[in-house]
């Protein structure tokens, strides 16, 4: 079966490698153009491009798939089916119509929950106990296509969005490798999503990780995991970002201390919040490397408020 693979970031590398290793014929890889990256704005290739080149798969990097010339190039690959894994552009109907079997998408959530660009972040913020990955057939409506395969697993209490997104995408690649042959043979009974049960996530912005100490400690602790690695969770300290990398919520703590006030208790570095206290475990002051909160506090005894 001739597969056209569309993906861009590091999390889309594992599914590509798994499909290749399982013997599927990948006729081409479509990925975003090389972009400037880092402080020096060095032109950098997407991780999926580098992986495809290692595997000897032809690579196509259009600026946009809205361009008729790009659509013609996709047709020239003569794919029977397409696979999409974090490509970075919504596919229009003329692109969706190219492969006879359409496009399959790996989405790291238990659809119809958490449609959109940040499903694992959404699950962590909500305090969910379960997470999963779904294989769907793409339709014009975002993440709303019929489900061809789904895997559900417990979400660890210390789950961090970046790590778990990568893990779920890898497991999605394994699931996809199993689904594809059965799908091509017409042996899968697709499950239509119940739109009335759908929930949605939004694109994450840099300001989403800014802490409001009036929020409950449990909410802030979830933020430190949901916004890892980007944008991170931080406060402004002397007009500079002070990142809280790891923390623990003490929901049973109660006091009359103003939210945002630093205090110590039994060797723990704590911050009062709107409900409970947040124990700081690992922090990163501006311009410095990550460090244990206790080490930071020894050199910052004069700071009383975050």
Swiss-Prot record:
GO cellular component terms given for this protein: cytosol
InterPro entries cross-referenced by the UniProt entry: Fmt (IPR005794), Formyl_trans_C (IPR005793), Formyl_trans_C_sf (IPR037022), Formyl_transf_N (IPR002376), Formyl_transf_N_sf (IPR036477), Formyl_transferase-like_C_sf (IPR011034), Met-tRNA-FMT_C (IPR044135), Met-tRNA-FMT_N (IPR041711)
Keyword Hydrolase: no
Enzyme class: transferase
Residues bound to (6S)-5,6,7,8-tetrahydrofolate: 109-112
UniProt GO molecular function: methionyl-tRNA formyltransferase activity
Reactions catalysed, as given in the entry: L-methionyl-tRNA(fMet) + (6R)-10-formyltetrahydrofolate = N-formyl-L-methionyl-tRNA(fMet) + (6S)-5,6,7,8-tetrahydrofolate + H(+)
Annotated keywords: Protein biosynthesis, Transferase
HAMAP family: Formyl_trans
Protein's job: Attaches a formyl group to the free amino group of methionyl-tRNA(fMet). The formyl group appears to play a dual role in the initiator identity of N-formylmethionyl-tRNA by promoting its recognition by IF2 and preventing the misappropriation of this tRNA by the elongation apparatus.
Family: Belongs to the Fmt family.
Protein name per Swiss-Prot or TrEMBL: Methionyl-tRNA formyltransferase
């Amino acid at each position: 079966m001739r597969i056209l693979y569309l993906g861009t970031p590091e999390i889309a590398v594992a599914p590509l490698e798994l499909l290749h290793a399982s013997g599927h014929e990948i006729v081409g890889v479509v990925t975003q153009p090389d972009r400037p990256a880092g402080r020096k704005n060095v032109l950098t290739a997407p991780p999926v491009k580098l992986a495809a080149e290692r595997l000897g798969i032809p690579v196509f990097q259009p600026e946009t798939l809205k361009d008729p010339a790009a659509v013609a190039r996709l047709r020239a690959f003569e794919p029977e089916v397409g696979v999409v894994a974090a490509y970075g552009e919504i596919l229009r109907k003329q692109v969706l119509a190219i492969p006879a079997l359409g496009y399959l998408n790996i989405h790291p959530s238990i659809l119809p929950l958490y449609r959109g660009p940040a499903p694992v972040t959404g699950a962590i913020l909500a305090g969910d106990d379960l997470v999963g990955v779904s294989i769907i057939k793409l339709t014009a409506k975002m993440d709303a296509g019929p489900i061809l395969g789904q895997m559900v697993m417990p979400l660890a209490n210390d789950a961090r969005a970046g790590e778990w997104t990568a893990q779920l995408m890898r497991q999605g690649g394994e699931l996809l490798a199993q689904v594809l042959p059965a799908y091509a043979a017409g042996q899968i009974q697709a499950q239509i999503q119940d739109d009335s049960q759908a929930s949605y996530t939004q694109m994450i912005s840099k300001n989403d990780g800014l802490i409001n100490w009036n929020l409950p400690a449990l909410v802030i602790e979830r933020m430190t995991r949901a916004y890892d690695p980007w944008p991170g969770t931080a406060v402004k300290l002397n007009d500079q970002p002070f990142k809280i990398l790891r923390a623990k919520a003490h929901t049973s703590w109660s006091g009359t201390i103003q939210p945002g006030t630093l205090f110590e208790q039994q060797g723990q570095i704590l911050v009062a919040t709107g409900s409970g206290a947040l124990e700081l475990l690992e922090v990163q002051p501006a311009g410095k490397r990550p460090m244990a909160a206790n080490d930071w506090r020894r050199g910052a005894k004069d700071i009383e408020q975050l």
